[in-house]
Amino acid sequence: MLKWLGGSGGTGDGTDAKLDVAAAKSFIASLPPEDSVRAAQDVALWLEGLNTEAATPVALRYEIADLVDGALKRHGQRLLDQYLALKPQAKFQEGLIWRSVMGAWKSLGDAYVSCADQFAVEKSAVNRKKLVQALARAMRAQMLQIKWILLRYGYVGETCWKVIGHLHAQAEAAGCLEEVIEIYPGVHGQGTIRQELLRTLILAVSSTGGLSPLKQHVAERAIAHFSRDFVSSGKMAEDCNFVFDLNGSAPPARVYAEVPRNAKLFFFGASKALDAVQSVIDKLNDTGTVPNDIGLQGTAPEWVADALLHLAFNWEKELPERDYERRKVAMTLQVTQGFDGVQAGANAPVQETWVIENASDEGYGAIVPERRGDWLQVGVLVGMRPEEDGASWGAAIVRRVESDARGQRRVGLQVICRTALAGTMCTMRAGGGRGTPQTVTLLDLQPSKSGYMQVLVRPESFTLREEMELTRTMDGAVFVMDASGIVESGPDFDRVRFLTKALAEY
């Protein structure tokens, strides 16, 4: 008996459960409307049960998978919104959401793969439309799993690539790679299996380890919008600067990467999408607003611009040379977390030791030991001190996070100061009074020749519209200044540029 239908969506003990549409609708109605984590977990378990029912007619299994898929959409979107709003330190909640979503998308993908395989075996003309739709939806589910792995800066393993290769083979055998179908209901629901494949592969080669989770999401939505302009070929071609082994033996990569033996090569590239992305970037620069036709309404223009610039850079036929030469080194790096870690330095309660494997004038490439750095994401601030004679505690920002097949993480750090200096800052009021002093970190010892200094402050600690007074802790030097602009912001810091007006001594 189908005991998996018991619990939140079945008949209680499951002894008289029946696999039919009514049972699926009953299960969907039982999903907790305001607890999307629980709903995703229940969906994953329920679909796992569905996937064991091979003796059930495939048309019925597909109809049920479709119903559950529709119910999962709202919860999946809510969990994505919650995930992107999390602070890097919220690891328990991050892990809970991530595991729930991944379990649901994997079970849904498995359901569609199973249905597609059965449709392909039966070769029924009646079910051909469902075969094509099942293949496209299975490919979409693989893309969503890859997206969530990348959001966590994880490594996409061989299993995903083999499933993608298998789905392509099924579509090729059925002659439906280019067939335009309704993948999902809605205005933007039409597409082809080839587009779904290219959307997945382009996401994988877009170096999302250089984007924050929120900008990764923006990039994925942009990739979906531009996917009709992507191209592919069975042989090397002008606009196809990436390659994938359809046997699933390795992740997609640039064509100059080593190709596995006996590979079935699939070449692809952004092609006209690169020009289309650049056109949107130009419009953003001209108007300061996000165009309505790219599906990113309501997204901050600066996030869209950053994500699109990143995509355009990584889709180019050849990557430009680095601005700074990397030098191989072997030393350790003491690391502290966030704004508080920068201020505390050696006194921080939590410190980690990373291994530097290369260095440049701009920063470091480091290896993060196993079970360390689970709080890492692009854009976070770290305090750091290299293992060098006379080195001070400085500050850096994480610019890249990547994982390999062994789970080892590599991090790219941009150093924003080699010696971080403590200070306090307060607002200077019109009547001569002072606001409450707040602790800050000076990134510059003195103003530049043109009078500018950069300072790290906590977000929203100042309006930055009034005159400010900065006191350098080590010697009591005072700087009177106005904010010139926020250079960048992170989860727990604003990096602000100030123009100094006067310098006095206490």
Model-derived features with residue positions:
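Sequence-level detector for tyrosine residue identity
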Residues: 62, 83, 112, 153-155, ...
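Short, hydrophobic/proline-enriched secondary-structure or compact coil segments at domain edges
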Residues: 108, 142, 194-205, 494-498
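Generic N-terminal leader/targeting and pre-domain segments
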Residues: 1-151
